[in-house]
Amino acid sequence: MGDIKLIDRVSAINWNRVQDEKDAEVWDRLTGNFWLPEKVPVSNDIPSWGTLTAHEKEMTMRVFTGLTLLDTIQGTVGAVSLIPDALTPHEEAVYTNIAFMESVHARSYSNIFSTLCSTADIDDAFRWSEENPNLQRKAEIVMQYYKGDEPLKRKVASTLLESFLFYSGFYLPMYWSSRAKLTNTADMIRLIIRDEAVHGYYIGYKYQRGLAMQDAATQQELKDYTYELLFELYDNEVEYTQDLYDEVGLTEDVKKFLRYNANKALMNLGYEALFPKDETDVNPAILSALSPNADENHDFFSGSGSSYVIGKAVNTEDEDWDF
């Protein structure tokens, strides 16, 4: 690969001297979007949770456990692995923000579990995540690139995880939300999706910047690698989806959602879509549930979700409004 000038010593970061304005733009977006799971009233979903069948509850817990694994990988390995490849100190700072928020996402699922589920059911779900071959396989695939020595391939794997691999799981809370179930949980997932949209966009952008520094042969090799990796991940994801959703008859809908987001991941990397439009016609109710207050899904420019609350509710007094 061509020579890329990496940071070779530590200097005090100066946000008044930004080499790439995208770093400052994304930093501001991520910090402006900051949220914590404790501020989302998931307990309001307890009555709704009680209307689900035993299998639906098990499926939902398994979906969230799978998402927890991906967030754990991205927070402790994936985003961190990108830091040594950063071209600017501000890029390093954005990756540390991404890593932290991935850990917040992983924590969020535990908040959902502790609110809605018994300890025994939680333990069963995590045991399932350790034993499910397709879930473990996708973890192994991305981890081998995170631990490799090719920076641009790391960014491809990271973008595919952020913009594609999460979505077999994100489908289910949007499905429940479209049926007026687990709506507060869905609000939390929308906050996660909003973050992941920025993460995938930014890492894909940095990939494109790095790709432009390579010669034509290397660029073609990386493009071929990207599509090969996507095919490998997609085939595994289809099996994972079948395992989760076959019994409730949602598999084909979820696969359309997967293909739709696979195309988005490729776009983040600067490549053309792989799947034709008739294979990505996602259920409109799901797209609407993704962003109920906007015409565009993945609207990460909006504020916190509609259920997001700050602090506990208290009675106000006249002097509270004297600013």
PLM regions: where:
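Non-heme di-metal
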Residues: M1-F323
